[in-house]
């Protein structure tokens, strides 16, 4: 197969998740909510062997697959919602781009030709396109993405309908005390390409849309693209002033009680099928892991 895997590596199977949770409990880990995490940081409690589960965007498999498993094991978790993906007003372009690259040996993007015959070339092409897209300003972002998808006969809205939850799923989940919803912006823009006002508008609009649906205040936020390339001091300071209790990035790392002063740039650890509990054991001393 010529399928490439950047997006596939960001998810795990239901079987793996169920087994992983069982193994965590067998090894003495406590699975806590984002609110418990913040309380522990604030009180400087001993936080050895504690795990927080977080999920981004609002994928349908969060509802269909992950939720029943979390419910079965009584595990709290947080979903950072992007309303634009939930209401189908924007595209999850990263999945569409991967499909286009997988199915073609040569592609054109923004008037440039990229060869992608081998698996290595396809993987490289994905990261090249991703890098180019994340450097587009707000006015170019969807224009160039949508043009690329149309040129390749991709119906992104149809694809999104199969990938993401609907508001009815969100409302149902919000009635369960195990579930906390956070915000992930309205349109999933890379925030470092927006002005301060545009960032604030993106975040506040997302909050309002989610709060209107679930009738609860949104207190937590995840950057839509959260590496050191997209999130720096400027973006962190803006979010720090918007009243969130916590803000998470995708920078790799565990959480210490010292993060009390850095609650608006918390690191996380990506859970993959290759993740082993022993890896936590090597780095868990006096830390909380967010997954």
Descriptions of predicted regions:
Residues 25, 69-73, 165-183, 256-260:
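Acidic (Asp/Glu)-rich catalytic clusters
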Residues 65-69, 169, 234-238:
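A short acidic, amphipathic alpha-helical/loop segment
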Residues 89-176:
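Extended, charge-rich helix/loop segments that form flexible
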Residues 18, 64, 127, 142, ...:
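Generic alpha-helical structural signal
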Residues 64-69, 73-76, 113-132, 280-291:
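Electropositive, surface-exposed helix/loop patches at the edges of structured domains
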């Amino acid at each position: 197969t010529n399928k490439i895997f950047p997006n596939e590596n960001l998810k795990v199977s239901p079987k793996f998740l169920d087994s992983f949770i069982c193994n965590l409990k067998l090894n003495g880990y406590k699975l806590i909510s984002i609110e418990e995490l913040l309380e522990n940081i604030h009180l400087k409690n001993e936080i050895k062997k504690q795990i927080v589960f977080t999920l981004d965007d609002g994928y349908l498999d969060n509802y269909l697959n992950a939720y029943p498993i979390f419910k079965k094991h009584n595990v709290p978790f947080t979903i950072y919602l992007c309303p634009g993906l939930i209401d189908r007003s924007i595209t999850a372009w990263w999945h569409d781009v991967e499909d286009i690259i997988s199915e073609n040996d040569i592609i054109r993007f923004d008037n440039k030709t990229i060869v992608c015959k081998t698996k290595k070339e396809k993987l490289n092409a994905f990261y090249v396109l991703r890098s180019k897209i994340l450097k587009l300003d707000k006015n170019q972002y969807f224009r160039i993405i949508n043009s690329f998808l149309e040129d390749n006969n991709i119906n992104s809205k149809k694809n999104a309908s199969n990938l993401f939850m609907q508001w009815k799923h969100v409302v149902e989940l919000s009635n369960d005390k195990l579930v906390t919803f956070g915000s992930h912006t309205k349109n999933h823009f890379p925030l470092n390409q927006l002005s301060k006002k545009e960032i604030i508008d993106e975040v506040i609009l997302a909050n309002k849309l989610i709060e209107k649906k679930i009738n609860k205040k949104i207190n937590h936020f995840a950057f839509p693209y959260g590496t050191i390339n997209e999130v720096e001091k400027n973006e962190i300071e803006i979010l720090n002033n918007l009243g969130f209790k916590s803000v998470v990035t995708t920078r790799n790392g565990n959480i210490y009680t010292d993060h009390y002063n850095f609650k608006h740039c918390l690191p996380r650890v990506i859970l993959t099928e290759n993740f082993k509990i022993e890896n936590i054991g090597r780095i868990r001393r006096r830390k909380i892991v967010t997954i």
